[in-house]
Swiss-Prot record:
The gene is ATXN3L. GO terms for cellular component: cytosol; nucleus. PANTHER family: ATAXIN-3-RELATED. Its EC number is 3.4.19.12. It catalyses: Thiol-dependent hydrolysis of ester, thioester, amide, peptide and isopeptide bonds formed by the C-terminal Gly of ubiquitin (a 76-residue protein attached to proteins as an intracellular targeting signal). It comes from Homo sapiens (Human). This is Ataxin-3-like protein.
């Protein structure tokens, strides 16, 4: 199913994969999502500052890490919601009483976003067919209309949050092709998460080995040390197995919409939907607008003798990193470098003249 855009899991960037799989193109990067998260953090900071920048609540707030992003690549539902807004899309919780009153059959929707802890993935309809676009899978998974409602119900039983995406999604080749092509059955995609599990096991065992090695170097080895080492390994295996069991059940649950194990021959073409010039222009306008708004908000919130950058929360935003770099390179540093180069050139010319 090559004409369906499907980003696979890289690190913990599932929010990015979820959005791009929904929109069917490389519409969002980690830097752009971090920019949205930083904007949300700043808006929250300004609201807290209304109670006074010296209040205990405000100072305690500044010490807390961002709730909209972290160093692993996780982004909050607020970031996802704001990212979708400038495409004219909004998300509604599937269990929202107002939504449930409408009595809409899930198969009449266009897409869903699902979340459990720090994992996000998309379920989307192309033409007449539903597909699970979980980035933990090696490829898109067909979900029959009859299985969709049960699939969503099982996700919620497993403590998943399910959100309905409202609005017109960008046009894509997959949607056009699957309006005219009928898909009866297709191969169940392989799990893309096994590699992640093995990497986690390796990290756990390596940590245990390093810890035991350090203790052995300090106090020497003995039979008791060997027993403790084996016990630590066994405990780490049990803990990893518990975590992996949950990961496996999560992946298996996401695959229960599959309706068969054979595939119909379909034309294979490369996806033509990654961000075109028009989406790029829209994105540039969007982020430029938010940057201008943020500058205006900072100017309004700044108090005499206080700079807004002194009151920012811990963040890994690319904007903050760029700001730090620019502050480090002062005019005096540049001038000193120029003076040094000129002095070296003068000495070289003097030596050549004497020769």
């Amino acid at each position: 199913m090559d004409f369906i855009f499907h980003e696979k899991q890289e690190g913990f960037l599932c929010a990015q994969h979820c959005l791009n799989n929904l929109l069917q193109g490389e519409y969002f990067s980690p830097v752009e999502l971090a920019s949205i998260a930083h904007q949300l953090d700043e808006e929250e900071r300004m609201r807290m500052a209304e109670g006074g920048v010296t209040s205990e609540e405000y100072l305690a707030f500044l010490q807390q890490p961002s709730e909209n992003m972290d160093d692993t690549g996780f982004f909050s539902i607020q970031v996802i919601s704001n990212a979708l807004k400038f495409w004219g899309l909004e998300i509604i919780h599937f269990n929202n009483p107002e939504y449930q009153k409408l009595g809409i059959d899930p198969i009449n929707e266009r897409s869903f976003i699902c979340n459990y802890k720090q994992h996000w993935f998309t379920i989307r309809k192309f033409g007449k067919h539903w597909f699970n676009l979980n980035s933990l899978l090696a490829g898109p998974e067909l979900i029959s209309d009859t299985c969709l409602a049960n699939f969503l119900a099982r996700l919620q039983q497993q403590a998943y949050s399910v959100f309905v995406v409202k609005g017109d999604l960008p046009d894509c080749e997959a949607d056009q092709l699957l309006q005219i092509i009928s898909v009866e059955e297709m191969d169940t995609p392989k799990l893309n998460g096994k590699k992640l599990v093995k990497q986690k096991e390796h990290r756990v065992y390596k940590t245990v080995l390093e810890k035991v090695s350090e203790e052995s170097d300090e106090s020497g080895t003995s039979d008791q040390d060997e027993e403790d080492f084996q016990r630590a390994l066994e405990l780490s295996r049990q803990e990893t197995n518990r975590e992996d069991e949950h990961l496996r059940s999560t992946i298996e649950l996401s695959m229960q919409g599959s309706s068969g194990n054979t595939s119909q021959d379909l034309p294979k073409t490369s996806c033509v939907t990654p961000a075109s010039e028009q989406p790029k222009k829209i994105k540039e306008d969007y982020f430029e607008k938010h940057q201008q708004e943020q500058k205006q908000q900072q100017q309004q919130s700044d108090l005499p003798g206080h700079s807004s950058y002194l009151h920012e929360r811990p963040t890994t935003s690319s904007r903050a990193i760029e700001s730090d770099l620019s502050d480090d390179i002062s005019e005096g540093t540049v001038q000193a470098a120029v003076d040094t180069i000129l002095e070296i050139m003068r000495k070289n010319l003097k030596i050549k003249g004497e020769k």
